[in-house]
Every structure is written in C-alpha cells, then in structure tokens.
C-alpha cells in the first residue's frame, strides 16, 4: 500500500513559492540542498499540482487541497497555449484532477479550451497530432503524444461530444501503424510529409534510432491501455498487451526499474529510469482491470 506519511512529507518539502509567477513549480532537489523551479510552460508543469490533488484524495487533508488549488491556478495561462502537444497532460494532471475532485465551471471551461487547442494541432491528411514546433522535422510525432490523448477522452465525457475521442483514436491508429516495429518496440520520433507518408523514423532521447528508449515504451503501453478503455477496440488491447510483453522480456534489473534504454549496455554505471518503471506499473495496473 501507500506510505502516506512519506508521500506527504515529500510534497510538503516541495511547496515553494518563487518570485516569478511563471516559475513556481518545484521540480527536484540537488542533494537536498538546492531547489529548482521550471517554467509553467515546461512539459512537466502539471505533475506537481496533480500530486497535490492525489495527496488530498488519499488523506482528505484540506491543506493539500489548498495548495493544489494554488499551484493549479498558476497554470491557468496554459489554457491559451498552442505551442506543444504536452498541453494534454500539463492541464489534465492539474486541471483534470481539480475538476474530478472539486468541479467548478471555470476549470471545466479551461479543460475544453485546452482540448480545442490540442485538436488544432491535428492534421487530418496525416492523421496525427503534431508534437513539436521545433527541430529539423517536417511534422514530428513522438510516442509520448499517446499520453496527451487522455485529455481528449476526458473532455469528450465532459461535453458529450465524441469529436475529441474520435480524433484521439485516429491519432492512436496512425501511431500504431507507423511507430512500432515487428517486435512491438517503438521509435521515439516519426516525422511525416504533408501527404501523410513517413519522412523519417528516428530518436531524440533514446540511445540510437533503432533502440528501445525505456520511457517511450512505457508511454506507448499507457496510451494504448487508455485507448482500449475508451473504445473497447480489441486492436488497442492487443497492442497494449504486446508492448507489455516486450517490456517484461527486456527488463534486465532485479527490481524492474529499467535501464534508461532497453538497448543500453547492462553495466552498473548505466543510468536507470524510475519514471519509466512508474508509468509502466500504472499502465499494468489498469490493464489488469480491463
């Protein structure tokens, strides 16, 4: 079960308010001696408010609710941000959990506006949501984008409008077709030409273009689990199960915290990725219930 006291101590430690309203989200400590805050436009900005909402859900402690509201409100400008696919989980982790636990109309409207902006990054000719607006690619789509689909599913439920869900599932279908190899490992980046053909398959964070970046495999597993939950399409279930089987075969560590890339050398000094393990565990728990 949860060590609630330990979780609460970590969150209390990280409640820091900076002078710059755009740099208020604690990210990590350096040996416990220095605190870093990143911009609200960083892709992880919704995680800390989301953690506070979960702490409130677990404990009922009103202080966590108060802090969750405060740190969620700092992200309110993101409802108008159109510059990345990551607005999906930046807002869903924060505002999504806020509305789930304490529904108010302003939060609902922020979620709908964000979903509309995310839909604006969808290209119907390609069948995908564009990930980045930088770099050398024509229309880059990264496997991480599967995590942003939950916002579209959620807003479909909020509004009763299936257009969000249908767009998300189309993205998932295109990604399933082009991102995955025969063994169900995935490329990190697939870039498309304007006519929908593939321009390039490569990596931006993995060890090499044809390796299996650990967090990327976890993103895919989580995303296709969500897609099956929302659609009951057996193809998505098979995809999730096959990705899970790949991960189980490839994990080389006794504690199941993988090397940062499944093709990285299995040596003591090779970094490991606890976030990949956490995402995988969360996906497997949900997959076991479907």
Q: What is each PLM-predicted segment?
A:
Residues 1-290:
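Glycan-recognition and catalytic cores of secretory/periplasmic carbohydrate-active enzymes
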């Amino acid at each position: 079960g949860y060590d609630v006291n330990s979780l609460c101590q970590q969150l209390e430690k990280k409640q820091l308010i900076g002078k710059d309203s755009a740099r208020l989200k604690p990210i990590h400590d350096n040996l416990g001696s220095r605190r870093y805050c990143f911009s609200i436009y960083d892709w992880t900005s919704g995680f800390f408010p989301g953690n506070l909402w979960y702490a409130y859900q677990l404990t009922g402690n009103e202080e966590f609710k108060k802090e969750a509201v405060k740190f969620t409100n700092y992200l309110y400008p993101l409802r108008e941000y159109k510059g990345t696919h990551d607005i999906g989980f930046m807002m869903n982790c924060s505002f999504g959990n806020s509305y789930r636990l304490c529904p108010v109309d302003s939060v609902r409207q922020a979620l709908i506006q964000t979903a509309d902006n995310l839909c604006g990054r969808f290209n119907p000719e390609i069948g995908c949501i564009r990930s980045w607006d930088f770099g050398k690619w024509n229309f880059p789509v990264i496997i991480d984008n599967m995590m942003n689909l939950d916002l579209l599913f959620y807003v479909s439920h909020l509004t009763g409008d299936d257009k969000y869900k249908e767009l998300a599932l189309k993205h998932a279908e295109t990604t399933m077709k082009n991102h995955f190899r025969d063994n169900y490992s995935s490329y990190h980046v697939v870039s498309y030409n304007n006519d929908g053909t593939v321009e390039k398959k490569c990596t931006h964070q993995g060890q090499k273009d044809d390796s299996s970046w650990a967090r990327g495999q976890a993103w895919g597993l989580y995303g296709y689990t969500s897609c099956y939950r929302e659609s009951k399409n057996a193809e998505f279930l098979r995809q999730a199960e096959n990705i899970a089987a790949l991960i189980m075969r490839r994990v080389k560590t006794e504690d199941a915290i993988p090397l940062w890339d499944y093709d990285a050398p299995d040596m003591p000094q090779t970094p490991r990725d606890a976030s990949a393990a956490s995402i995988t565990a969360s996906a497997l728990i949900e997959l076991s219930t479907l």
